[in-house]
Amino acid sequence: MAITLTWIGHATWLVDTGHGVLLVDPFFEESPTACMKGADVACDAILVTHGHADHVGDLVPIARRTGAPVY
């Protein structure tokens, strides 16, 4: 089974295990390097490495929209 890592920008990554997608440090809308919008993200879980704004900027709207648990 292959795991696909996709760098979105800044510290934001999508990790696709083939069984689900993990979003790491959701920071899209204020990120000058983000290659997509937070509204376009589909994920099964969200991992936040720490509480700085540039790692949690879009956490709440994405978690609410997707229902993904936050770790």
Label the predicted regions.
Residues 1-6:
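Extreme N-terminal starter segment of soluble prokaryotic enzymes
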Residues 12-52, 57-64:
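Pre-active-site segment of Zn-dependent metallo-hydrolases
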Residues 44, 68-71:
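Short internal beta-strands
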